[in-house]
From Swiss-Prot:
It comes from the Eukaryota. One of its GO terms (biological process) is autophagosome membrane docking. It comes from Mus musculus (Mouse). The keyword Transport applies. PROSITE patterns: T_SNARE (PS50192). SNAREs, soluble N-ethylmaleimide-sensitive factor-attachment protein receptors, are essential proteins for fusion of cellular membranes. SNAREs localized on opposing membranes assemble to form a trans-SNARE complex, an extended, parallel four alpha-helical bundle that drives membrane fusion. SNAP29 is a SNARE involved in autophagy through the direct control of autophagosome membrane fusion with the lysososome membrane. Also plays a role in ciliogenesis by regulating membrane fusions. InterPro entries: T_SNARE_dom. Residues 198-260 form the t-SNARE coiled-coil homology domain. Keywords: Autophagy, Cell membrane, Cell projection, Cilium, Cilium biogenesis/degradation, Coiled coil, Cytoplasm, Cytoplasmic vesicle, Golgi apparatus, Membrane, Phosphoprotein, Protein transport, Transport. It is found in: Cytoplasm; Golgi apparatus membrane; Cytoplasmic vesicle, Autophagosome membrane; Cell projection, Cilium membrane. This is Synaptosomal-associated protein 29. Gene3D superfamilies: 1.20.5.110. Residues 20-32 have a biased composition (Basic and acidic residues).
Length: 260
């Protein structure tokens, strides 16, 4: 047998527990129609304005954080393109040097074929060969557009780090500096004079200004990378032609050596 009386409703406890839950956010449809309705409506509108201003500030801060990260990635990619250009230019110079050495070898082979020619060439002064290139760090200059974009972004990097030490949590760092008022204690003053709302508006405007500048940097980086890639494509085309020509000359020289 149950220990409860017959008239006991087991769901009464649930009702009491539900009453202890925090009240949901007021909606305009939940506002009373009594004499306090105008005051409640004003308070609701102020809360709604603050809530939306806070959400907008957080959203623009997140967008700003993503923009900073994108710019850093763009600069890193541009620097890798510059390094790649240096490798291509160095490779092209090495191929040119190999072609010169191969031409000199072909002249020696042709002179060896004739004993008389060999004696004459023996007493002739040897041609002056260019000094070998010193192997060192490869220094290459990118196109002017990309170089300017990289320098501009790097100049701004210190400013970004000083303003936002942790870019991945930029939105938290930004909003923590904004004084917040509890939603239940909104001032009865007209909200344009509200310091919290004014701070949110200033933060939103500042974020939008920085977003505009940052997007301009991203555009310059993208255009500079496009020009750099096109120029490196030209280097690759030249290098491919020279390598093909060098391969043919090597096979021809090898054939002449076997005929000696």
């Amino acid at each position: 047998m149950s220990g409860y009386p017959k008239s006991y409703n087991p769901f009464d406890d649930d009702v009491e527990e539900e009453d202890t839950r925090p009240a949901p956010w007021k909606d305009v449809r939940d506002l009373p129609d009594g004499p306090d309705a105008p005051i409640d409506r004003q308070q609701y509108l102020r809360q709604e304005v603050l809530r939306r201003a806070e959400a907008t500030a957080a959203s623009t801060s997140r967008s700003l954080s993503l923009m900073y990260e994108s710019e850093k990635i763009g600069v890193a990619s541009s620097e890798e393109l510059v390094r790649q250009r240096g490798v291509l230019e160095h490779t092209e110079k090495m191929v040119d040097k190999m072609d010169q050495d191969l031409k000199m070898s072909q002249k020696h082979i042709n002179s060896i074929k004739s004993v008389f020619g060999g004696f004459i060439n023996y007493f002739k002064s040897k041609p002056v060969e260019p000094p070998p290139e010193q192997n060192g760090s490869i220094v290459s200059q990118p196109n002017s557009r990309l170089k300017e974009a990289i320098n501009t972004s790097k100049d701004q990097e210190n400013k970004y780090q000083a303003s936002h030490p942790n870019l991945r949590r930029l939105q938290d760092a930004e909003l923590d500096s904004v004084p917040k008022e509890p939603s239940s204690t909104v001032n009865t003053e007209v909200y344009p004079k509200n310091s919290t709302l004014r701070t949110y508006h200033q933060k939103i405007d500042s974020n939008l200004d920085e977003l505009s500048v940052g997007l301009g940097h991203l555009k310059d980086i993208a255009l500079g990378m496009q020009t750099e890639i096109e120029e490196q494509d030209d280097i690759l085309d030249r290098l491919t032609t020279k390598v093909d020509k060098l391969d043919v000359n090597i096979k021809s020289t090898e054939k002449k050596v076997r005929q000696l």
